[in-house]
């Protein structure tokens, strides 16, 4: 697609250089059986699973723009799914969303929902990765926090999230795909800041 759009390999590589930096330094060639560079999706699924393949395809870039295929990046998506699953073994006590992650939870619900509607799947997934990192930074997740993560991740990794939904105590008949989408509160999407004025009396000259 890039070769057709830019007319030459040199022009296509320059375009990717501007957009992706070092990623674009790999030679750009068409996928062809004769060149032996065709990616077999079945092999990727066999190695990493269908959810990882699905997640990577939606994370690799905007649907309306071409992006280089990076097999190495698939492993990164697989590690992300592993981290989400591992949160089920790191549940912490507490009801609902904890104060330290509440704002990010509501921001993520809002952004993922909006991005799905506009087909910006890559930025929705990036937001989920940010949230998962924050949960790890805060020692894990409450059940409510992880349930929300699982719901938001379901469109991108349906098989794993359905299993994880059951692991969190939901019945097999309570299919996650038909469960109500999480709701956010606009007021809680805004970072709360407190300004504290500190006066050092020794520096005040009267």
Go through the PLM ranges and name each one.
Residues 1-4, 9, 173-180:
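Short, positively charged
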Residues 2-6, 13-50, 64-75, 187-190:
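Conserved phosphate-binding loops in nucleotide/dinucleotide-binding enzymes
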């Amino acid at each position: 697609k890039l070769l057709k759009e830019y007319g030459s390999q040199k022009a296509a590589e320059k375009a990717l250089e501007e957009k992706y930096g070092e990623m674009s330094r790999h030679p750009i060639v068409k996928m062809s059986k004769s060149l032996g560079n065709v990616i077999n999706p079945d092999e990727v699924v066999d190695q990493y699973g269908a959810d990882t393949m699905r997640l990577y395809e939606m994370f690799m870039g905007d649907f309306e723009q071409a992006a280089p295929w990076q097999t190495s990046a698939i492993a990164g998506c697989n590690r992300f799914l592993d981290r989400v699953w591992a949160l089920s073994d790191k549940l912490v006590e507490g009801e609902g969303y904890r104060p330290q992650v509440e704002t990010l939870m509501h921001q993520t619900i809002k952004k993922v929902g909006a991005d799905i509607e506009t087909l910006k799947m890559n930025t929705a997934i990036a937001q989920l990765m940010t949230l998962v990192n924050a949960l790890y930074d805060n020692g894990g997740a409450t059940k409510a926090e992880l349930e929300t993560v699982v719901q938001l991740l379901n469109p991108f990794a349906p098989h794993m999230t359905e299993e994880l939904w059951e692991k969190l105590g939901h019945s097999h008949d309570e299919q996650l795909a038909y469960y109500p989408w999480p709701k956010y509160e606009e007021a809680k999407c805004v970072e709360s800041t407190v300004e504290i004025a500190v006066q050092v009396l020794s520096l005040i000259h009267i």
